[in-house]
């Protein structure tokens, strides 16, 4: 892209306007039109980054067994269903710390329910084949009533504060600084169990959000796939991002009936589709999956399978990058799904800036920053009404 006045004329661009492309188009009569078109395509694809240095793995990050308020699956059946029926690569069992209303808490007894959860995670862990993450869901009023803790090992202790079911700002800050745990809230938009990203201190906002379970996207208020009975302003992903929070996204089904990772046809749209997380990781191990989540190299979607490869100047989703004065953002988009993709939106600072209705592979050039640090992510919509999202990339220019 060498035209000296391109940045005077436009904000967004694409490889199809490069000089080599134009020269081929204006090359006159050609003996092999098909071969010419192939060269035209090659001139655009040469701007693409190399193949990803990571592998894609899919997982279930939120579900319950009879150890708390699950109604059908014990911890063995839980992992078996996810591994053998949903055919996912990794899973976290996230039973409630209160153990289910009227039942013993997870830490009660010797051995305790938590001991069973630890041992079951170890039992089903097969490095390279199926990864189990030790986790649980913790009530944490008033900041996040439903908050899930994911650990980087199978021997971690539960985190209890001054008062069970609650958390103080001091306790939350200490938790967010730990390297061995990732904290991700659930139902942040809910009136009863939500969060207020527009009001709380910025350093209390978690590094990721659970975007969707079965229905109810937490992207923004008024999303067309939202079906819950209550919602509350301030608890959405975009509320946090617009404040400057560096927040990525994951998903989980929050199933209580053993249908984790699978379509629940009887529930109808949108609730029949489970939230599924995708990660870009070096390997399918506890260390590999945890590192990918901690780094926000994550995307998520409603049911089935979807792969989102989103990079800016070679950097992956979840990264914060700085460009030089003469550099511009080379935005790479490549999305694949198990059904036809209806629309891909490039969202910049909360607004759709480029939409693809048909193409699923595209390089976009963005010449200008709008604020000190811009955030970019993709929103994907399929023909059957499912949605997908990826963690943002944050871009600062010198």
Region spans (language model):
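Extended, charged catalytic domains and RNA/DNA-binding interfaces, predominantly
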Residues: 1-398
